[in-house]
Amino acid sequence: MKNIRYIDKKDVENLIENKISDDVIIFLSGPTSQKTPLSVLRTKDIIAVNGSAQYLLSNNIVPFIYVLTDVRFLHQRRDDFYKFSQRSRYTIVNVDVYEHASKEDKLYILQNCLVLRSFYRREKGGFIKKIKFNILRQIHKELLISVPLSKKGRLVGFCKDISLGYCSCHTIAFAAIQIAYSLKYARIICSGLDLTGSCSRFYDENKNPMPSELSRDLFKILPFFRFMHDNVKDINIYNLSDDTAISYDVIPFIKLQDISAEESKDMTRKKMQYRTSTDSYAN
């Protein structure tokens, strides 16, 4: 633990400086991700998670960030992790992935990935935990968290600055959203944020099937999204999924044409900026 270098403010600033689009698409594992056209994916920064990166890479789309928070993926699909990490521009893993990695993999992670700190191991409440996070909240205004007094209750939270850490909630989507928010994207657009039925993944897992635990944990997950909606007033987030467990009053639905329309505006603005710069050189 002492030798871990966690993601810091300079890392976040570097990521912000290297963005290539105003919006970001979080490309998740839900079946509806396949409905997002490649033409749209090619125009935006992409945050890929788990095995969803394979689909992007096979279509010559390089993820801006590859995110992994599931220890099982590193253990069961190690070669894929290395491939996805090496072919993405940046990789972010949480501290659990690092701590449960082999010595060789730990070295790779420290040299090639950014490590994300988690504020807690379990979402259980309690008096001591409440005091701890009340103090942290006073020190770090970017940490929004609500901790019940009873250990039977479950805390909920959201961190606006990943250099401090992140609030986990049994789905990598929530980690990716906190990353995207920290990088100050104009719009955060979720693709494949379904969480319905058995919460199956759209990509082939014949080699190393990893049972999804999302349907079992849904009652733990949904309050975090509601908390985000109620407390992160300036977040501009949308869902492309037309089959989702998350209410559209929490994360609004967005049509593909609305993304394309904004994309056209971006292209026009960039052309105008280019013309202005060339005119200034001419003068």
From Swiss-Prot:
Query: Which pathway, metabolic or otherwise, does it act in?
Result: Bacterial outer membrane biogenesis; LPS core biosynthesis; Bacterial outer membrane biogenesis; LOS core biosynthesis
Chief localization: cytoplasm
User: What is a single cellular component term in the Gene Ontology annotation?
Assistant: plasma membrane
What does the entry give for GO biological process?
Answer: lipopolysaccharide core region biosynthetic process
Q: What is its EC number?
A: 2.4.99.15
**Locations listed in the record:** Cytoplasm
Alphabetized Gene3D superfamilies for the sequence:
Alpha-2,3-sialyltransferase
GO MF, any single term: transferase activity
Record's catalysed reaction(s): an alpha-Kdo-(2->4)-alpha-Kdo-(2->6)-lipid IVA + CMP-3-deoxy-beta-D-manno-octulosonate = an alpha-Kdo-(2->4)-alpha-Kdo-(2->4)-alpha-Kdo-(2->6)-lipid IVA + CMP + H(+); alpha-Kdo-(2->4)-alpha-Kdo-(2->6)-lipid IVA (E. coli) + CMP-3-deoxy-beta-D-manno-octulosonate = alpha-Kdo-(2->4)-alpha-Kdo-(2->4)-alpha-Kdo-(2->6)-lipid IVA + CMP + H(+)
Instruction: Extract the InterPro entries matched here.
Output: WaaZ_KDO_III
Traits of the deletion mutant: Mutation of the gene results in changes in the LPS core but does not affect the attachment of O antigen in an E.coli strain producing the O antigen from S.dysenteriae.
**Keyword annotations:** Cytoplasm, Lipopolysaccharide biosynthesis, Transferase
Described by its record, this protein's role is as follows:
Involved in the biosynthesis of the core oligosaccharide region of lipopolysaccharide (LPS). Required for the addition of 3-deoxy-D-manno-oct-2-ulosonic acid III (KdoIII) to the KdoII residue of the inner lipopolysaccharide core. May also play a role in a lipooligosaccharide (LOS) biosynthesis pathway.
Q: What else is known?
A: KdoIII is found in only 10 to 15% of the LPS molecules on the cell surface of E.coli K12. Overexpression in an E.coli F470 isolate (with an R1 core, lacking the waaZ gene) leads to the formation of truncated LPS structures, lacking up to 3 hexoses from the outer core, and which contain a KdoIII residue not normally found in the R1 core.
Q: Which NCBIfam families match?
A: PRK09822.1, WaaZ_KDO_III
Q: What is this protein called?
A: Probable 3-deoxy-manno-octulosonic acid transferase
Which species is this record about?
Answer: Escherichia coli (strain K12)
Gene name of the record: waaZ
